[in-house]
């Protein structure tokens, strides 16, 4: 027997290897390399939003109250976009607009760009986190692929759309009522609901909800257990040793209901992935089109005939008039920097006004 005495053959770890060991260590909350992007960005985005909705006014940018301090509640508080005059400035705290003055920076709308940019990179970090963990446990990266849908929508609505317009001012502010205002704006100024990309997005999201409900109900329906004591609530027993979900029974059921049914789990679950993600991506593509002021369907022949014949009206022509009403009422309120003044006689008035 030979005994070798000497130095270990292991090389001392470099900085990268040491960081890799620490970041990817198995712990209660995984950090990973993606965490270097995710955690700081998520912290700053959420912290900026909480700060803005609690303390910061939108008086200087929109002429509005937008914080709890001013009397707003959770539904009406918001971190609002910068003024239109600031165009696409990044509004850095140390930039020429705020010049390091935190109060002035908040008044100018600097928190909005802060939250939007950190939020976007935080979402990207979360997608990378799913990819990194999938690699670590040898899964395929479909979770990360699925999460690209919400990221595409966020980036298109909050970043690309205002970049195509005159400034960040026309992006949505971060708040519940503020998002509703933005939806009304999209309809009135872009006829968004008649846009085929919006239609595909609605089909994707509502179709995904339908698929999710059908799938959950079908799995619950086809859980079975051998023995005499089986009942509905035994299906929730976590101590059952093995899977007792019957794909064959589910296939027979839906074949009788619809005449067609998924024949294997892979195709079924891929379809459940494909429908919502494709819908979200189509919506994002549509918003990029709106950033460039591309129009939705225009049925000009109906508009001309409606203008010539007072008795001719379609749901399309009614919607066009409603959009004109949204624009007339909204523009003066929504864009105070334009100093728009419309005579009373041109404003549409309903019976309740």
Swiss-Prot record:
Its EC number is 1.10.3.9. This is Photosystem II D2 protein. InterPro entries: D1/D2, Photo_II_D1/D2_sf, Photo_RC_L/M, Photo_RC_L/M_CS, PSII_PsbD/D2. The chain crosses the membrane at residues 41-61, 125-141, 153-166, 208-228, 279-295. Its main location: plastid. It catalyses: 2 a plastoquinone + 4 hnu + 2 H2O = 2 a plastoquinol + O2. It is an enzyme of class 1 (oxidoreductase).
